Structures are given as C-alpha cells and as structure tokens.
C-alpha cells in the first residue's frame, strides 16, 4: 500500500523564492531536534511557528505501551489535530514554520500497517479520510528533513525524559526511519526538500541562515552538511544534490 501523501489539490508556491509568507515544514524522527530548529527559523525568517502537540496528546502514552490497541485512535487524533493546524496556516496567510506536518502522519500510519500494528481495514479507512481532507490542504513550500539515526533519536528521547515517550523502542524508530526514506523520495517530486545531517546539534540560527540561502537556489532534494561550530574556522560547505527524477 502506498502512503497517501500526494493528493493535495492546492499546490504550494514552489516557484516562489522569497521566504516571506512561506510555509516551511520540518520533518524528522522523534527527538531529531525539530522544535529547536523551528524556533530558530521562525526568529531568523520572522515567521510564526507551529508546534507538534505532545504533552496534551490524549493517546500518545497509551499508544507507546500498546501500539496495536491504540494505533488507529492515535492516527485519527493526530490527523484531526494537524488538519486544524494546517487550516490555520492557510487562512492566516502569513506562512509559518511547522514542527511536523499532516503529511508525515501518513508515514506513521503506513509504517504501523506494514508492521502489523494497524490492520488493513483501519489503514484503508485512514487513507480514505486523509484523501478527503487533502482536497482542502495546501502543500508546504519547503520541507526540511533532519537526518538522524534511530540510535541517536533514541538517545535524545531518553535525555529529554518525557513520560509519554518512555516506551519508545529502537525497533519502532528503525521502522520509522525506513518509512521516512520512502516518504522523502516520493514527496520531493512535488515539494522542494532540504536534508540536513543533524547527528550533532549546531548553532540553529546560523543553520537557519544557511537554509535561507540554499532555498533561494535549490531545486527538488538538496542536502546540507552543517559546519562544525567551534573556536576554529569551518571548512564544511553546503552540498546540493538535486534528485534524478
């Protein structure tokens, strides 16, 4: 089964290169650092920020304890929550930096289905609902994907020590990592994607400036290797690798 991510009837403004009013989505594994970068980008680009609901999520902790029992309920809850946030971004017409979008929810749902944690009946119901909602959605102008390994993701999850995430397993993160790889290959045909090696945190505001410069010249999928920030000069540079489509 394919991930239902490409049916948005209202396209993003891919040709626009000014970041004023741009809708930027930040994707990545749990604990990748999406919120940290969202705050920095919002500040540097003077865009409103929209964050993922975690603490007030009514299903998340139950899901991590028993994903097979609560998988469908969680996915419907998240789909509704992110659709509401997506509509807010559209109608306020100011753009914004969004910490995880509605499109990524379909990545989680597909992964749960393939892992046997979401049966075909529930997954098909989810996909049909997603496709119906997609008629009222607008694609982001840019996706920034924070690339971290499942091991690094789990390490950061343990460091931030949220009760609702204490049952996240490495196997779950590995399956999610694989699902993201397929998602990025698909979505980059429609929305520009910047992949960032985020294995080690760097200065988020300086990285935001790099992203701004890269977006002005990019096409399809690009990659940024952030410099190592320290006392000495930096020698790394932005590496652009457009996809061969």
Curated annotation (Swiss-Prot):
Its EC number is 2.7.1.76. GO terms for cellular component: cytoplasm; mitochondrion. The keyword Amino-acid biosynthesis does not apply. Substrate binds at residues 52, 64, 75, 100, 105, 165. InterPro entries: Deoxyribonucleoside_kinase, DNK_dom, P-loop_NTPase. ATP binds at residues 28-36. The active site is at 99 (proton acceptor). CDD domains: dNK. It catalyses: 2'-deoxyadenosine + ATP = dAMP + ADP + H(+). One of its GO terms (molecular function) is deoxynucleoside kinase activity. GO terms for biological process: nucleobase-containing compound metabolic process. Can also efficiently phosphorylate medically important adenosine analogs, such as 9-beta-d-arabinofuranosyl-2-fluoroadenine (fludarabine). Specific kinase that phosphorylates deoxyadenosine but not any other deoxyribonucleoside, as part of the deoxyribonucleotide salvage pathway. PANTHER family: DEOXYADENOSINE KINASE (PTHR10513:SF35), DEOXYNUCLEOSIDE KINASE (PTHR10513). Belongs to the DCK/DGK family. This is Deoxyadenosine kinase. The gene is dak.
């Amino acid at each position: 089964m394919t991930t239902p991510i490409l049916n948005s009837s209202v396209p993003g403004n891919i040709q626009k290169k000014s970041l004023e009013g741009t809708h930027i989505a930040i994707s990545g594994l749990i604990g990748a650092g999406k919120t940290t970068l969202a705050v920095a980008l919002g500040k540097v680009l003077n865009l409103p920020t929209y964050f993922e609901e975690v603490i007030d999520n009514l299903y998340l902790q139950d899901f991590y304890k028993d994903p097979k029992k609560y998988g469908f309920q969680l996915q419907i809850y998240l789909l509704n929550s992110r659709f509401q946030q997506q509509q807010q971004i559209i109608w306020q017409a100011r753009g914004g930096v969004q910490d995880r979008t509605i499109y990524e929810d379909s990545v989680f749902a597909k992964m749960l289905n393939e892992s046997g944690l979401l049966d075909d009946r529930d997954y098909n119901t989810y996909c049909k609902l997603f496709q119906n909602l997609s008629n009222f959605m607008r694609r982001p102008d840019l996706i920034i994907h924070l690339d971290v390994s499942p091991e690094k993701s789990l390490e950061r999850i343990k460091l931030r020590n949220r009760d609702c995430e204490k049952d996240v397993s490495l196997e779950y993160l590995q399956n999610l990592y694989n699902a993201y790889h397929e998602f990025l290959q698909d979505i980059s045909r429609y929305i520009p994607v910047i992949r960032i090696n985020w294995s080690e945190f760097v200065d988020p505001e300086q990285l935001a400036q790099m992203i701004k410069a890269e977006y002005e010249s990019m096409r399809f999928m690009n990659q940024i290797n952030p410099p190592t920030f320290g006392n000495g000069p930096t020698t790394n540079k932005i590496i652009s690798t457009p996809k061969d489509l």
